Curated annotation (Swiss-Prot):
This is Small ribosomal subunit protein uS7. Part of the 30S ribosomal subunit. Contacts proteins S9 and S11. The lineage of its organism: Bacteria, Bacillati, Bacillota, Bacilli, Lactobacillales. One of its GO terms (molecular function) is tRNA binding. It comes from Streptococcus pyogenes serotype M1. PROSITE patterns: RIBOSOMAL_S7. One of the primary rRNA binding proteins, it binds directly to 16S rRNA where it nucleates assembly of the head domain of the 30S subunit. Is located at the subunit interface close to the decoding center, probably blocks exit of the E-site tRNA.
């Protein structure tokens, strides 16, 4: 770890189409090899597909999906007296969105649809309906935290 001060967090700019910072962060997560234009096209096409399929505003559907994906609790390893315990801790707001976006994009990439735009759109719609792999990931994380509730007093 660095001995110097922690680097300041850089502020992401809101995207031009939806004027939303979380959409910019989604574009950054989808981006591969620095191809931001391609990533933006994928995300915006997915949002258009969501709008056509649901008839609702794509940004609202996306925000509902993110609320259903973002974890409230997670477990962290804590070493006490020579053994490791999985200690449940609350997730900070910044980490909640980061984990939610990471799980959403990873679940989208693992899907079977033909194009990434379709995979992302379907995963967002599934998450908005409380189904899909990304929501399952959140449920598994919460289950793990619940199972290890006995070690909550080791919190730091």
């Amino acid at each position: 770890m660095s001995r110097k001060n922690q680097a300041p967090k850089r502020e992401v700019l809101p995207d031009p189409l939806y004027n939303s910072k979380i959409v910019t962060r989604l574009i950054n997560r989808v981006m591969l090899d620095g191809k931001r234009g391609t990533a933006a096209t994928i995300v915006y096409d997915a949002f258009n597909a969501i709008k056509e399929a649901t008839g609702n505003d794509a940004l609202e559907v996306f925000e509902t999906a993110m609320d259903n994906i973002m974890p409230v609790l997670e477990v962290r390893a804590r070493r006490v007296g020579g053994s490791n315990y999985q200690v449940p801790v609350e997730v900070r707001p910044e980490r909640r969105t980061t984990l939610g976006l990471r799980w959403l994009v990873n679940a989208s990439r693992a899907r079977g649809e033909h194009t990434m735009k379709d995979r992302l759109a379907k995963e967002i719609m599934d998450a908005a309906n409380n189904t899909g792999a990304s929501v399952k990931k959140r449920e598994d994380t919460h289950k793990m935290a619940e199972a290890n509730r006995a070690f909550a007093h080791f919190r730091w």
